[in-house]
């Protein structure tokens, strides 16, 4: 059992502080949080809005910085709200409201907020790994803005905790080109998926997994969204994904406990580096 693939069970659309405990207690070791921006490219709310997955309340939200503080409590050892299992947070950056030329600025403002309210200015802040998930390949300058700001503020080492994802279901080769432009190698998750009310095949997941497992691929980890059924969970695990985003973490947990899957997979812990490609 020593060489089982670590799996990140990603609680989907966790936008209110109270939902952090709710999803982790159901088995999530990772959460996905939506971030909306104001007209000046400041991250404003953790908010998804309508439409969203069927069966979910689309309108729960917090002020962004309040959410970061709540998340920090949940991921700081010794805090009364600490959840040891929560090790990865995917921020789904809703940059569609921004002009392309605001992307770099959005990255800078993002980094400032995260540094202050989540990382506590580098002084015993939250420990979770962070994925910046960007829906538009043209918004790759956000990554540089983010990195530049952390460096300027004296904490370039925090980039060790940061990974990347382009979530627009673009052609894998186009995603690779965007990372080249952004100067990013490594720490790359690749998402693929669709809202839970629509079916989607696994052909692009298979392409992402093939890239991840090839000698010259750029992808480190692959996740699939939004998976709410046992059958789809099994299909995704069979395809070799590293993460499954879900509205029902307990469903994914149940499948991982089935005999056939228990042998090959386990729930990732803090000791599993989410930027390292798993070797079968």
From Swiss-Prot:
Which residues carry out catalysis? 12, 48 (nucleophile)
Write out the GO MF terms: lyase activity; metal ion binding; phosphoric diester hydrolase activity; toxin activity
| Keyword vocabulary terms for this entry | Cytolysis, Dermonecrotic toxin, Disulfide bond, Hemolysis, Lipid degradation, Lipid metabolism, Lyase, Magnesium, Metal-binding, Secreted, Toxin
List required co-factors: Mg(2+)
Q: Which reaction does it catalyse?
A: an N-(acyl)-sphingosylphosphocholine = an N-(acyl)-sphingosyl-1,3-cyclic phosphate + choline; an N-(acyl)-sphingosylphosphoethanolamine = an N-(acyl)-sphingosyl-1,3-cyclic phosphate + ethanolamine; a 1-acyl-sn-glycero-3-phosphocholine = a 1-acyl-sn-glycero-2,3-cyclic phosphate + choline; a 1-acyl-sn-glycero-3-phosphoethanolamine = a 1-acyl-sn-glycero-2,3-cyclic phosphate + ethanolamine
As recorded in UniProt, its EC number(s) are 4.6.1.-
Q: What job does this protein perform?
A: Dermonecrotic toxins cleave the phosphodiester linkage between the phosphate and headgroup of certain phospholipids (sphingolipid and lysolipid substrates), forming an alcohol (often choline) and a cyclic phosphate. This toxin acts on sphingomyelin (SM). It may also act on ceramide phosphoethanolamine (CPE), lysophosphatidylcholine (LPC) and lysophosphatidylethanolamine (LPE), but not on lysophosphatidylserine (LPS), and lysophosphatidylglycerol (LPG). It acts by transphosphatidylation, releasing exclusively cyclic phosphate products as second products.
Protein name, entry field: Dermonecrotic toxin LgSicTox-alphaIA1
């Amino acid at each position: 059992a020593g060489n089982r693939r670590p799996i990140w069970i990603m609680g989907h659309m966790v936008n209110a502080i109270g939902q952090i405990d709710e999803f982790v207690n159901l088995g999530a070791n990772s959460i996905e949080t939506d971030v909306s921006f104001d007209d000046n490219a400041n991250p404003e709310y953790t908010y998804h809005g309508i439409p969203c997955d069927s069966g979910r309340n689309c309108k729960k939200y917090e002020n962004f910085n309040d959410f970061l503080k709540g998340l920090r409590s949940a991921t700081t050892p010794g805090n009364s709200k600490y959840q040891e299992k929560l090790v990865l947070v995917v921020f789904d950056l809703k940059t569609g409201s921004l002009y392309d030329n605001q992307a770099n600025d959005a990255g800078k403002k993002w980094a400032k907020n995260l540094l202050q309210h989540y990382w506590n200015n580098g002084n015993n802040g939250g420990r979770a790994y962070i994925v910046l998930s960007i829906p538009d390949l043209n918004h790759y300058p956000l990554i540089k803005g983010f990195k530049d700001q952390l460096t300027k503020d004296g904490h370039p080492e925090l980039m060790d905790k940061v990974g990347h994802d382009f979530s627009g279901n673009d052609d894998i080769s186009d995603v690779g080109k965007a990372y080249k432009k952004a100067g990013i190698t490594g720490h790359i998750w690749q998402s693929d998926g669709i809202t839970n009310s629509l079916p989607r095949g696994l052909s692009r997941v298979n392409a992402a997994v093939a890239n991840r497992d090839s000698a010259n691929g750029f992808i480190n980890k692959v996740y699939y969204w939004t998976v709410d059924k046992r059958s789809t969970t099994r299909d995704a695990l069979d395809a070799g994904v590293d993460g499954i985003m879900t509205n029902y973490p307990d469903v994914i947990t149940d499948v991982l406990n089935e005999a056939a899957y228990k042998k090959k997979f386990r729930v990732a812990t803090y000791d599993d580096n989410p930027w390292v490609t798993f070797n079968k």
